[in-house]
Structure formats: C-alpha cells, structure tokens
C-alpha cells in the first residue's frame, strides 16, 4: 500500500445505482487508490478492497466480528497473509444520535476517532430525502461532515459528504496538522464510515 499516492483531498464515490454497494477512492490527481465492494446477503458485514477497477487484485478485507449492530467491531486485514491493519467500532449508545467511531491500530491500541461535526445537519439531510421531488434537490446543498480526531480532541482530517442524483461523494481533507497516522488506515476508516453511515441512514 505504501506505493499508493495518498495526496489530499481524497475522494470516495458511493454509487447509488449498483446492485452491490461499491465505493471508488481516488486521490487529488484523480488516480485510483481503491475499488471497494461490500457483499450482500451476509449476516456479518464483509467488504473487500481492491487495487484495480476490475476487482482482480484484493488488498484488504474488512469483516464484522458479529452480526451487524452498533457493538460490532469491523476488523481490517491484508488480503495477502491476513495481517491485521486495524479496526473500526461504533462506540455504544453515543452513536445512536451523534456518530462516533473509534479506530485502533493492528495491536488494538486506540489511534483516533471519527465524530460527526453537527448531527442536526445529517438529520436535515435525511429529512429532505423523504420529501418528493424538491427534497433531493434541496439536499444537494446540505453537506454533513465528520472530523477525525486524536485522543486529545485535536482534529486532523475532515470528511465532507456531497451528493448528486446518482452518487454520494465523500471528500477526505487533511487539516494541515503533523499527526503521523497511517495513510492506509485513514483511507480504510473513511470507507468503513461510509458503509456504517449508510446503514444508519446517513449516507
């Protein structure tokens, strides 16, 4: 993964018209970083991250440790060899209203967390979705956002959701700090956040 060019902002595009949920991740130069596909009809969420558009070169697997729920831990491993990379977990009852995902490293040590900036924005975004015709149009001007923070509460990245009629676009912006988080884990936690928020009605 180290050979990939993680230049920011990174854009993740969630296609709305595919049968199985897919996310395409590109860097600021529009180079493909990851093609992501989530399996349908499984009790435990399972996602494969590929290096190519044709999905022939798997890079990572993301699997829930139990039947989907807010206590599930989504473990990230390398496709070759099964080496642990990290995990993403929604933190209990707090996540029912305001998104909060804890991200750990390969040794299960807390590394950073992802938190919704303003839950009312996402509430308005979901509300507009239910209004015929004008709702989806108005919702294109609503941009829910999330902050990636360290244990001290310092924000290092921002995830911003932008929508169109055929896709959801998530932009991962670096806020100019000097935190040395693994770029692969930051990108993979972005992907898992998109899928988890989709299940909660926020993506």
Place the predicted regions along the sequence by residue:
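Intrinsically disordered, low-complexity proline/glycine-rich segments
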Residues: 1-203
């Amino acid at each position: 993964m180290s050979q990939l060019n993680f230049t920011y902002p990174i854009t993740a595009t969630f296609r709305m018209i595919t049968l199985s949920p897919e996310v395409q991740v590109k860097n600021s130069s529009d180079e493909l970083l990851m093609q992501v596909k989530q399996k349908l009809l499984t009790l435990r969420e399972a996602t494969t991250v590929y290096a190519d558009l044709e999905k022939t070169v798997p890079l990572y697997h993301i699997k829930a440790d139990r039947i989907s729920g807010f206590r599930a831990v989504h473990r990230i491993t390398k496709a070759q060899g099964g080496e642990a990379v990290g995990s993403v977990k929604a933190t209990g009852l707090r996540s029912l209203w305001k998104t909060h995902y804890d991200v750990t490293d390969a040794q299960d040590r807390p590394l950073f967390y992802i938190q919704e900036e303003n839950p009312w924005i996402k509430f308005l975004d979901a509300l507009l979705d239910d209004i015929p015709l004008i709702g989806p149009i108005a919702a294109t001007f609503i941009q829910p956002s999330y902050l990636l923070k360290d244990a001290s509460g310092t924000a290092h990245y921002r995830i911003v959701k932008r929508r169109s009629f055929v896709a959801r676009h998530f932009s991962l912006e670096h806020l100019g700090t000097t935190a040395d988080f693994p770029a692969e884990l930051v990108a993979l936690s972005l992907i898992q956040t998109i899928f988890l928020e989709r299940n909660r009605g926020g993506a």
